[in-house]
Curated annotation (Swiss-Prot):
GO terms for cellular component: cytoplasm. This is dTTP/UTP pyrophosphatase. The keyword Cytoplasm applies. It is found in: Cytoplasm. The keyword Ion transport does not apply. NCBIfam families: maf, PRK14365.1. GO terms for biological process: nucleotide metabolic process.
């Protein structure tokens, strides 16, 4: 199998990629610093960030496939990344309570051997339940929201805050597996070889 490198420190992305290709990859965290760029819309921004992460990590390798991603939640015209404090998480949850939000992941797959690069985004509609102040406080105090875009983990306790989704569930977690699997197959990484 060809070398695959995940350009992410996210334990969730690592777990998701292992669902597709087992543990046949290495992790190399990008040193690229994400900054908001006013001239870009949210979709362009997450794609740009994922591309810059992939390019940064590619400098450390001679061959292989680099996978990078950037996920945000978009609500009422605002980009919600990861909350930095408990109060910030509380404010985000109050903002998205009872609303439909978008989980948007920019993803780059860079084949260093062929030079092929796919950079695109995947969106998933997420309908949040109307949350009480007590629910928000309890969830925030659990600590789970702190390293999650939009301050909720659909794959954890935050699942009870989500009424429904339309789109790729794994995209909300941080890596759109359907689209990623398709691209990897196109690049010669067989998902079903070991089945």
């Amino acid at each position: 199998m060809r070398k695959v490198v995940l350009a992410s420190a996210s334990p969730r992305r690592k777990e998701l990629l292992s669902k597709l290709i087992g543990n046949n990859f290495e992790v190399c965290v990008s040193s690229y610093e994400e900054t908001p760029l006013q001239e870009m819309n949210v979709e362009e921004l997450v794609v740009f960030h994922s591309l810059e992460k992939a390019k940064d990590v590619a400098l450390r390798f001679d061959s292989g496939i680099i996978i990078s991603a950037d996920t945000v939640v978009f609500c009422d015209g605002a980009i919600l990344g990861k909350p930095h404090t408990l109060n910030n998480a509380k404010e985000m949850l109050e903002n998205i309570s009872g609303k439909s939000v978008l989980a948007i992941t920019g993803m780059t797959i860079l084949d260093m051997d062929s030079g092929k690069c796919v950079s695109e985004y995947v969106s998933t509609d997420v309908n949040m339940k109307q949350m009480s102040s007590d629910e928000i406080a309890s969830y925030v105090n659990s600590g789970e929201p702190l390293d999650k875009a939009g301050a909720f983990a659909i794959q954890g306790k935050g699942a009870v805050l989500v009424e429904s989704i339309n789109g790729d569930f794994f995209n909300v977690v941080g890596l759109p597996l359907f689209r990623l699997g398709t691209i990897l197959e196109e690049m010669g990484i067989s998902i079903f070889d070991d089945c």
